[in-house]
Regions:
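Generic detector of ordered, mature protein regions
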Residues: 69-76, 80-81, 117-118, 143-156, ...
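Charge-dense, low-complexity intrinsically disordered regions
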Residues: 184-389
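Intrinsic-disorder-associated interaction segments
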Residues: 2, 6, 124, 129-132, ...
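An N-terminal structural lobe/cap that precedes and organizes the functional/catalytic core
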Residues: 2-124
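Internal, well-ordered alpha/beta segment that forms a basic, Gly-enriched binding/recognition surface
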Residues: 76-181
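Generic structural hydrophobic/aromatic packing signal, biased to beta-strands
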Residues: 47-50, 135, 226, 269-271
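Generic surface-pattern signal
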Residues: 14, 18, 22, 136, ...
Length: 389
């Protein structure tokens, strides 16, 4: 589920429905079961890469397992729900559930990502092959989620049409907005088509050449891990880079690829993009290159917090993250404009894009906590934890 939808559901299940005879615990359980059922049914028939029938699907990790093991505590990790304190989704994840997907076979999982998932390869220059593998992996997880979300939102829409006489259903869909659900179905359909096209090009066609924007090695283990593609809406100059609220198939989003990989006693940060898209990010790259290292790390965190729900956090950092008002403020943005267009606006697309540029502006990076600094490293957090025993 996306930031906005999960927040709406979380707010909904916190309400008291005792006056209509509904137990909130049962409601939470029903929503969770509906989500799990929809997600379970949303599976491809064959591996989306090799297309060979009959092969067993692999429980693939978006972030390499050697990275996850570095920051896990007793095999556990925390995701963004730990920050939002969502009552709907489990906050703590085991290694087997940490940002995984099941849409490719075991053979493809082992073969197609072998170079970038080898930690020794990060001591030298990042190769085109490594960046190609990262880009492919970055497409597979959101592709899997788009398939699941389409199934979930379709189930919700069907429920809204068949439960019109239910007081609870009326309250629920008044809160969640049927218009929003329909818009999300349209968006996921567009995403699925676009991901399918991109995966086909990367796996079967001629892949892009990539340019590294920033590669940096920290001499300590950061407590946050991330790997994903980011469709930056804007940078530091109020320019529109990607209009993520234009669901027209002709609107092709141009992402940057971002990795934060904690290793033992070191952390690698990698930011790159397709060479053909560099001109779109010219202003962002120019400003980013002039920011000092500490500032760059804050920009990286702000981008992750604003755009993604797939980063993972060491339990050692849990209290700092969940109680930090600056993080809460960042997550409170969650821009989504379904049903929120002021009366009289004629050009809705332009209005939404202008609002998005304001909300996603990166100039507030200085307000982001220093969670990638040595102060919050795994080494320091473990030392502090030992002292408090």
């Amino acid at each position: 589920m996306d930031h906005y939808f999960d927040s709406m559901v979380a707010d909904f299940v916190k309400k008291d429905f005792s006056d209509i005879g509904v137990d909130t615990r049962d409601l939470r359980k029903n929503i969770t079961e509906m989500t799990k059922e929809a997600y379970h049914d949303a599976k491809p028939e064959t591996c989306v890469l090799c297309k060979v029938p009959g092969k067993k699907f692999c429980n693939s990790h978006t972030i390499p397992q050697f990275v996850l093991r570095t920051i896990a505590q007793d095999g556990k990790l925390l995701d963004w729900n730990a920050i939002l304190k969502s009552p709907v989704v489990d906050k703590e994840k085991g290694m087997k559930q940490a940002e995984t997907f099941k849409i490719i076979c075991t053979e493809c999982d082992k073969k197609e990502f072998a170079e970038y998932e080898n930690p020794s390869n990060y001591d030298g220059p990042v190769t085109q092959k490594m960046m190609q593998e990262i880009t492919l992996k970055n497409l597979l997880n959101p592709y899997s989620k788009a398939i699941k979300d389409k199934k979930l939102f379709t189930s919700l829409l069907n429920a809204s049409e068949h439960l019109l006489d239910s007081p609870l259903a009326n309250l629920m869909f008044e809160s969640l907005s049927v218009a929003y659900i329909k818009e999300k179905i349209k968006a996921t359909e567009t995403d699925i088509k676009d991901y399918t096209r991109q995966i086909h090009i990367l796996y079967h066609g001629k892949p892009d050449q990539y340019d590294v924007i920033w590669k940096y090695r920290l001499n300590y283990t950061a407590p946050i891990a991330f790997q994903g593609e980011i469709n930056l809406v804007t940078g530091f100059n109020h320019e529109l880079i990607n209009n993520i609220y234009d669901y027209d198939e002709k609107n092709k989003l141009k992402p940057i690829e971002l990795c934060v990989f904690p290793f033992l006693n070191q952390t690698y940060i990698l930011l790159f993009l397709a060479k053909r898209d560099r001109h779109l990010y010219r202003k962002f790259i120019k400003k980013f290159s002039k920011i000092d290292v500490n500032g760059k790390m804050k920009v990286i965190l702000l981008i992750i917090f604003l755009y993604s729900d797939t980063f993972l956090v060491s339990p050692l950092l849990a209290e700092e993250v969940s109680k930090n008002p600056k993080v809460q403020k960042t997550f409170s943005i969650l821009p989504d404009f379904a049903g929120g267009i002021p009366h009289g606006v004629e050009d809705v697309s332009m209005y939404v894009s202008q609002q998005a540029v304001k909300e996603y502006d990166l100039n507030s990076y200085q307000d982001v906590p220093d969670f990638l600094s040595e102060q919050y490293s795994i080494e320091h957090l473990k030392a502090d934890d030992t002292e408090n025993l």
